[in-house]
Amino acid sequence: SLVELGKMILQETGKNPVTSYGAYGCNCGVLGSGKPKDATDRCCYVHKCCYKKLTDCDPKKDRYSYSWKDKTIVCGENNSCLKELCECDKAVAICLRENLDTYNKKYNYLKPFCKKADPC
């Protein structure tokens, strides 16, 4: 769910997921879609594509369990869809951390300027 995703982003990046990524670029946040503006925005684009592959669970609402061991996210689900959901969220959180150097405040609230993205 959005709760676990937010916790993962905070743990990996140290940034508030809502204020830092909730309206970032063309793809971060619930309403985002469009050609990525930078590597950070591309993380969110890939994340949305990952979500599109999930058919048996709701990424925004369905809860899953994970642990934070030695600064590493460990998904802990037996249900295959929830495990995949956790892995999608884990991947975006790690991607955002790995691309912290591309984060640019000018890309917050950019949605009206987004061009159509390539399909996943």
Swiss-Prot record:
Cellular localisation: Secreted
Disulfide pairings: 26-114, 28-44, 43-95, 49-120, 50-88, 57-81, 75-86
Summary of the tissues where the protein is detected: Expressed by the venom gland.
CDD domains (UniProt xref): PLA2c
Gene Ontology CC: extracellular region
InterPro entries: PLipase_A2, PLipase_A2_Asp_AS, PLipase_A2_dom, PLipase_A2_dom_sf, PLipase_A2_His_AS
Molecular function terms from GO: calcium ion binding; calcium-dependent phospholipase A2 activity; phospholipid binding; toxin activity
Domain of life: Eukaryota
Pfam (any one): Phospholip_A2_1
Keywords of the record: Antibiotic, Antimicrobial, Disulfide bond, Myotoxin, Secreted, Toxin
PROSITE patterns to which the protein is assigned, alphabetical: PA2_ASP, PA2_HIS
Example GO biological process: lipid catabolic process
PANTHER family (alphabetical): PHOSPHOLIPASE A2 FAMILY MEMBER, PHOSPHOLIPASE A2, MEMBRANE ASSOCIATED
Note: This protein corresponds to 0.8% of the venom protein content.
Subunit text: Monomer.
Function: Snake venom phospholipase A2 homolog that lacks enzymatic activity. Shows moderate cytotoxicity against C2C12 myotubes (activity above 200 ug/mL). Also shows antibacterial activity against both Gram-positive and Gram-negative bacteria. A model of myotoxic mechanism has been proposed: an apo Lys49-PLA2 is activated by the entrance of a hydrophobic molecule (e.g. fatty acid) at the hydrophobic channel of the protein leading to a reorientation of a monomer.
Family: Belongs to the phospholipase A2 family. Group II subfamily. K49 sub-subfamily.
Name of the protein described by the UniProt record: Basic phospholipase A2 homolog LmutTX
